[in-house]
Curated annotation (Swiss-Prot):
Key words, A-Z: Electron transport, Heme, Iron, Metal-binding, Periplasm, Pyrrolidone carboxylic acid, Signal, Sulfate respiration, Transport
Main location: periplasm
Positions bound to heme 3: 51, 106, 109-110
Modification Pyrrolidone carboxylic acid, positions: 25
GO biological process, one term: anaerobic respiration
Changes after translation: Binds 4 heme groups per subunit.
Binding site for heme 2: 65, 83, 86-87
InterPro entries: c3_cytochr_TmcA (IPR054899), Cyt_c_III (IPR002322), Cyt_c_III_dom (IPR020942), Multihaem_cyt_sf (IPR036280)
Subcellular compartments: Periplasm
Protein name (Swiss-Prot/TrEMBL): Acidic cytochrome c3
Amino acid sequence: MFKHTLIALTLLAAATLFSLPAFSQEDMTHVPTDAFGKLERPAAVFNHDEHNEKAGIESCNACHHVWVNGVLAEDEDSVGTPCSDCHALEQDGDTPGLQDAYHQQCWGCHEKQAKGPVMCGECHVKN
């Protein structure tokens, strides 16, 4: 009886241990890249909530911004709206192209705060 219980507990522990990485991946945010087609580097991946907590970002519009007639709308955010709805692949007037928009948003903030990754391979990690 003890042998069967020990085997069952060992299998349960192993199943739990091996399932943990799957749960930790749930919170990972993949920067949308469908609009680009074939990529030179992998998409940037980060834990959204952990990033915002560590960076002290409290307002969604710090990253998910809305511009109205060339003015940043302070009380609005674009959560749920793909960046490609406003940013074409190439620059359009004063609106940066999609790749530049991503880079200006992320890299620009990291540079300004002197924190976070700024080298290509730090965000675009090859597996």
